[in-house]
């Protein structure tokens, strides 16, 4: 559930926020400021990192105290590895904002083209081992797959970085790729 909540909030909100600025014309005003493109991107995405971390802490609190789910691992490690997951969701959100022109398109594209397939291919609903081999290969490109393993490892097994490093490395690689691609497309749309 945590992976889906963060995917929903931290992917859809930034994409809609950037597209809204395109729609109302404030993005053009921001472009003429002396900010470097990377500064603009960080400024646009930083609030959503904070929102994602607040969501993480709220969901963890609800899981522990309302539903009695034990947190056997490190909360600090969970927060740090969640930052890697947020890198992925923010990259996707920024990428979506470069592909669409309206907020409605951003929401629909994010929900139906990205989010639904990612959830089905992550192993959250159907075990990856039960999927056809070709689809199993595709799941290696799905960030939710790795974050779900991280959540299960930290919450249920008390796993540390010694066990979770392959998932963390995958999130870092995919997230860097997504954010780089999205930043390049965003810069081209600014030029």
Which residues fall in each region the model found?
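Conserved hydrophobic/aromatic pocket- or pore-lining residues that grip, position, or stack substrates
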Residues: 2, 18, 30, 34, ...
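Long, hydrophobic alpha-helical segments
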Residues: 1-14
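Membrane-spanning alpha-helical segments of multipass transporters and channels
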Residues: 60, 70-191
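Juxtamembrane helix-boundary/capping and inter-helix hinge elements in multi-pass membrane proteins
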Residues: 32-38, 101, 160
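Selective transmembrane-helix segments that form parts of the transport pathway or gating/packing helices
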Residues: 35-62, 79, 83, 168, ...
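Transmembrane helix boundary and interhelical loop/hinge segments in multi-pass membrane proteins
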Residues: 11-35, 191
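Hydrophobic transmembrane alpha-helices and immediately adjacent juxtamembrane helices
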Residues: 7, 32, 38, 182-188
């Amino acid at each position: 559930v945590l992976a889906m909540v963060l995917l929903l909030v931290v992917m859809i909100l930034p994409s809609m926020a950037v597209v809204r600025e395109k729609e109302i014309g404030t993005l053009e005003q921001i472009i003429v400021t002396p900010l470097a493109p990377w500064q603009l991107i960080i400024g646009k995405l930083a609030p959503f990192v904070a929102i994602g971390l607040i969501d993480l802490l709220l969901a963890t609190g609800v899981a522990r105290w309302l539903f009695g789910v034990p947190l056997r691992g490190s909360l600090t490690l969970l927060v740090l590895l969640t930052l890697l997951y947020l890198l992925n969701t923010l990259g996707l959100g920024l990428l979506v904002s470069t592909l669409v022109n309206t907020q409605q398109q951003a929401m629909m594209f994010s929900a139906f083209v990205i989010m639904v397939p990612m959830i089905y291919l992550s192993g959250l609903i159907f075990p990856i081992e039960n999927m056809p081999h070709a689809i199993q290969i595709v799941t290696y490109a799905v960030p939710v797959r790795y974050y779900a393993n991280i959540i299960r490892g930290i919450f249920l097994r008390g796993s540390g970085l010694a066990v979770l490093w392959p998932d963390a490395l995958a999130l870092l690689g995919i997230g860097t790729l997504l954010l780089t691609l999205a930043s390049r497309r965003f810069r081209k749309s600014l030029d």
